[in-house]
Amino acid sequence: MAFFQSILYSGISGGVCHRERKATLFIPSLRCEKSGVPLAGRGSLFTLASGSPLLGAAFFAPQGRLGSGLHLPFKHSKVFEKGLVISVNESQLGLFYGLSFLCVAIAFAFAAYLYLWVKKQKTENAKIQEVSLLIKQGANTFMRREYLVLAKFAVVAAVVILVLLPSPIWTGNIVDNISMAIAYLCGTALSAIAGKIGILVATLSNGRTAEAAQKGIKPAFLIGFRGGAVMGLLVVGCSLLGVAAVLLVTGDSSILLGFSFGASSLALFAKAGGGIFTKTADVSADLTGKVELGIPEDDPRNPAVIADNVGDNVGDVAGMGADLFDSNVAAMASALVIAQSLSGTGFNNVSMVFCYAILGLFASIIGIATARVGKKGPTSALNSSTYVTTVIYLVLTAIATALFPGFSWRIWGAAAVGLLVGVIIGITTDYFTDDSKPIVKKVAHASSSGPAFTVLSGISYGFISALPAMVGIAVSALIAYKLCEPMGEGYAIFGISMAAVGMLSIVGMIISNDAYGPIVDNARGLAEMGGLGEETIRAADELDSAGNTVKAVTKGFSISAAGLTVISLLGAFMSEANDALAAAGRELITGFDIMSPTVFFGVLVGAVVPAVFSAMLILGVDKNAQRMVAEIHRQFNSIKGLREGKPGVKPEYDKCIDIATSGSLRELIPAGLMSIIATVVVGFIGGPSAIGGFLLGNIVSGLLLALFMSNAGGLWDNCKKYIEAGAEGGKGSDSHKAAVIGDTVGDPFKDTAGPSINTQITVVSLVSSLLSSVFVMFSFFS
């Protein structure tokens, strides 16, 4: 594999070979496609160097074979009946590299402006300042300890990559292995930086949002949204920066899989760890506060209340940001891997991927800058901004497709279909989770008959809610496939990858909406703890309700985007596996036959992994929450005056934060390692065919479970809030107690297991692609 990679990216300028790392080939003939001037005589040996992409070179080599007769798996080429053609547009690709870095700089500058704007807003309430500081310190403590654990994992993983990837170090080129390991570390580092800064801005924004709510919804919305937008801009900017830099420096899209694996491994642990933390605190606070003691949700007497607010940030800001960073990088990486394997216009397709990503970031910047609350309230403002961003993106990409030579309207159609289906999935998710829609009201009414009916109805509607999203993913993949299939071999799967790029093109706006949720959720609690009055709390409640609705929509969107991404990653896996198979002189993979025992073996194992992964995370929440509930009981029983709320008596908040932190870090590692180990074991047993089946089973099972759990949890959450607003007897009623039970069940569904599954799917897909050459060389039944 490494030998073949050493000849994939060869710099030829004016017929002169740049001699860096060399590979000598026997090529029957080689001539310039444009001028017809021979570059090497028929039947001669020709030396190509590696180290840079093919730029400004177009050449023709009949049959494209080595002297040994092995097929050359050029990533920029395709073997036609008449020969092997490679075509490159140097100036166009260079333009989009430059525009990528320029747009990233604009995004970072705008994020810095928003950060400074939020920081300038006044905060004067001493109690709010005190609690905000506790939340900030708790979040920083968790992030520091989590990143320390992840750093150790990253170092071990980087060493493994250095030794084995893209091919065992003793069989290949050490430079490629070093590049892959560095790219992996860069992926983890950029994701971690984006998450850390996002937490900083979120904890800065919450208190200011609470105090601004005294003046009304509009100023509070603007602070909360702009605080979240900093995270959105950083995530997309860092992902585009990393992808462009890695491809520019190495010229090898396969190295991007290492960068993407770094992002996805951090996302897996950040989302799972943050989810366990936040739901440990949330479940414990609800059970002891609302159910046992009957005290309000954000009552400062509850020892878990600060941990609950910390969890909102580490789970929904850092965790979801890392999740969508991973999805965005994986979508671009898979599209670029496939683009470089296409014939004739490979670099036009590479340019198209970058162009669409740039315009998506630009459209998100416009959408963020123009977001305002109108007469219809904050939910409408968030949705309107998303729709505006979508329209701007579609218009800009259509103009670019018309202007740039080599851009295809079929590929634009695939990207447009992906984005539009993503928006539609968001709308259907909203229907099942919004407390103004009939489904939530039906579950609330069922709660009047007891908690069993709350749980049963929520599970039922949760499964039904998966239907439109699954069908939407299937339809978008099918349309993208059929749109691009006439363009030639390999373009159909490229169309699916561009549908994923299209769906994630406005991810800057999506993350901004999602990060807004925990900021206003914290603000609502701070308004109550700071004694800002009922009118301010009502304004904060309205902002929080919009945040809950949008968070549910965002989760549906991110899961659906991951679905399309992993389908395209399956195509990238086939491309990488075929390179290794060609190098070994073995039959290439054209598909996966379900009747094959090795494929079916992979399907069954792959299908059960998401279920086991989910169970491990939910059990982690269960065990951790039991420890925290015991700690809360201890404090209420041992700290005199705490239960009565006597002045000057405070709970030991740090004890609950420590339980949530240590427990989440202890529970997240086994679940993540289980997924990776299962992939490796299946690969060594059945080879590439078994891995293909494994990925198919994992994708279908994982998407279904993720959508079900995310939507059912969001439904139960908003059912509880709907009753708390006065429906079905209001707070303290039997309906409310039943709804709290439903919400307690749904919390780890929607914020721990559900959104972590899509990251798990991405991780195993990337592990499969990265280890494809190893599985070809070392497997029992392939």
Where do the protein language model's features map onto the residues?
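Hydrophobic packing and interface segments
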Residues: 28-32, 38-51, 60, 64-782
